[in-house]
UniProtKB/Swiss-Prot annotation:
<dbReference type="Pfam" id="PF14714">
    <property type="entry name" value="KH_dom-like"/>
</dbReference>
<dbReference type="GO" id="GO:0042254">
    <property type="term" value="P:ribosome biogenesis"/>
</dbReference>
<feature type="binding site">
    <location>
        <begin position="249"/>
        <end position="253"/>
    </location>
    <ligand>
        <name>GTP 2</name>
    </ligand>
</feature>
<keyword id="KW-0342">GTP-binding</keyword>
<dbReference type="GO" id="GO:0043022">
    <property type="term" value="F:ribosome binding"/>
</dbReference>
<dbReference type="InterPro" id="IPR027417">
    <property type="entry name" value="P-loop_NTPase"/>
</dbReference>
<feature type="binding site">
    <location>
        <begin position="202"/>
        <end position="209"/>
    </location>
    <ligand>
        <name>GTP 2</name>
    </ligand>
</feature>
<comment type="function">
    <text>GTPase that plays an essential role in the late steps of ribosome biogenesis.</text>
</comment>
<dbReference type="Pfam" id="PF01926">
    <property type="entry name" value="MMR_HSR1"/>
</dbReference>
<dbReference type="InterPro" id="IPR016484">
    <property type="entry name" value="GTPase_Der"/>
</dbReference>
<feature type="binding site">
    <location>
        <begin position="55"/>
        <end position="59"/>
    </location>
    <ligand>
        <name>GTP 1</name>
    </ligand>
</feature>
<keyword id="KW-0690">Ribosome biogenesis</keyword>
<dbReference type="InterPro" id="IPR006073">
    <property type="entry name" value="GTP-bd"/>
</dbReference>
<comment type="similarity">
    <text>Belongs to the TRAFAC class TrmE-Era-EngA-EngB-Septin-like GTPase superfamily. EngA (Der) GTPase family.</text>
</comment>
<protein>
    <recommendedName>
        <fullName>GTPase Der</fullName>
    </recommendedName>
</protein>
<feature type="binding site">
    <location>
        <begin position="8"/>
        <end position="15"/>
    </location>
    <ligand>
        <name>GTP 1</name>
    </ligand>
</feature>
<feature type="domain" description="EngA-type G 2">
    <location>
        <begin position="196"/>
        <end position="368"/>
    </location>
</feature>
Length: 460
């Protein structure tokens, strides 16, 4: 996983930015200089891309303790992938900041100068003084007022890899391997095959409530052109081909800075709903077009390991070409959801809504699919023979065997001699081979690499 480190002198707002990017209060923030002395870190999502965010201790030469903090910060910076250097926009640039910044530029990593506390026109004028740092990537921020973050996120996203493989983060792999005997079939957890939980997600006013009404053939949600009409989640169950499908119509997600009161509460409820869903209907408005917020909502689906169907709503009002639109979604905006089927509908007229019901059943079948160990290993053997694993500094890298250790979503373990040497591009190759052989349309495929005989799960 790539890492982003926040560096700067004390009291420039690193902890506030850290908390904002983490979307929770982790680092202690105050007006007292140097509140954060030890590095904090947490996993975050930039749109749909995962990264480790590190909040370093403040750089300062004023006392012996901070000299040690500076030394440790520079060490962590060398091991990080992206550097954000923060300065206080209410203060004039100083030589000490320039010195720190130049030393970091020499590391040859993507680096940006982030000018925080730019709260008004006067601050914006003062920010021009930082141009003499000699860096192109300068971002004016006001973390407290939520200004400038979108531009920063857009820049960061360019340097983050999109992993089609969701890293395994659960302890059940270790529990599984403790009792697993090579070559044996495993008794998977029980999943109710007759009850499917589906979350309907999307930004405000894309037609989620109309879609729910069309799916259940009755008006259960209040429909209005007023953005954000639906605040409380609404559950409705139907029976389709002897399967119970439980729909949850979530409150629309607004852009940051426009979430107020009940709407903010609804956003939190949306996260909870996704955590209890198995399949997500990601609703997009083809009449209004797509935007960055759509991508962020798609990232929530990825975050929760859900099966997914992309629903192009209001297609009757759209002038888009379907094939061209699907290609754009899969190659550009939603390339991290390239495995998701795309279906065009008109929720208000009910056109093609019935297609969604059959597709939900199919995706759920894929979501709970079990692969025979023998078939999986035959595929892995053929794939590695066709494209041998790259050596690790001259040493042989070998996959001893592969086994599916969980479902909903399907999770596969690769038992290896050198799991850290398995590059993400080769993982992607294996994933594509597995998808070709077995039908995993619409579902994420988790692949974890583990060293044979070790108790530690090893992810590359």
């Amino acid at each position: 996983m790539q890492s982003i480190i926040l560096i700067g002198k004390p009291n420039v707002g690193k902890s506030s930015l850290f908390n904002k990017m983490a979307r929770q209060r982790i680092a202690i923030t105050s007006d007292i200089s140097g509140t954060t002395r030890d590095a904090n870190k947490t996993e975050i999502y930039i749109h749909s891309k995962k990264a480790m965010l590190i909040d370093s201790g403040g750089l300062d030469e004023s006392d012996e303790l901070f000299k040690n903090v500076k030394k440790n910060t520079l060490k962590v910076a060398k091991e990080s992938d992206i550097i954000l250097y923060l300065v206080d926009g209410k203060l004039a640039p100083d030589d000490e900041d320039r010195q720190f910044f130049y030393s970091l530029k020499k590391l040859g990593k993507p680096i940006a100068l982030v000018i925080n506390k730019v709260d008004n026109k006067k601050d914006e004028e003062r920010a021009w003084e930082f141009a003499n740092f000699g860096v192109k990537e300068i971002f004016n921020l006001s973390v407290t007022h939520n200004v400038g973050l979108d531009e920063l996120y857009e820049w960061l996203e360019k340097f983050l890899h999109q992993e089609f493989l969701i890293p395994d983060e659960e302890e059940n792999l270790e529990d599984f391997l403790e009792y697993y005997e090579e070559g044996k079939e495993f008794q998977f957890k029980e999943v109710d095959q007759n009850h499917i939980r589906v979350g309907i997600v999307g930004r405000v006013n894309v037609g989620k409530s109309s879609l729910l009404n069309a799916l259940v053939k009755q008006e259960r949600s209040v429909v209005s052109s007023i953005a954000g009409t639906t605040i409380d989640p609404v559950n409705e169950s139907i029976v389709h081909k002897d399967k119970v499908i439980e729909f949850v119509d979530t409150a629309g997600i607004r852009k940051r800075g426009k979430i107020q009161g009940l709407e903010r509460f609804a956003l939190n409820r949306t996260e909870k709903i996704l955590s209890h869903s198995q399949i997500a209907l990601l609703v997009l408005d083809t009449h209004e077009g797509f935007n960055e917020l759509d991508e962020r909502i798609a990232g929530l689906v990825v975050k929760h390991y859900l099966g997914v169907i992309i629903v192009l709503n209001k297609w009757d009002k759209s002038e888009m070409d379907f094939d061209k639109t699907v290609k754009e979604l899969r190659l550009d905006r939603f390339k991290f959801l390239a495995y998701a089927p795309v279906i065009s509908v008109s929720a208000l007229s009910g056109k093609r809504v019935h297609v969604l019901l059959d597709k939900i059943l199919q995706i759920f079948e894929n979501f709970t699919q079990k692969i025979q160990t023998s078939k999986l290993n035959t595929l892995i053997e053929n794939a590695t023979r066709a494209h041998p694993l790259p050596h690790d500094y001259g040493k042989l890298v070998k996959i001893y065997y592969a086994v599916q250790y969980d479902l909903a979503p399907p999770k596969i373990a690769l038992i290896m001699n050198r799991p850290k040497a398995l590059h993400f591009s080769y993982k992607r190759y294996l994933q594509n081979q597995i998808r070709k052989e077995f039908n995993f349309e619409g579902v994420p495929l988790v692949i974890a690499s583990r060293k044979k005989g070790s108790k530690e799960n090893d992810e590359s």
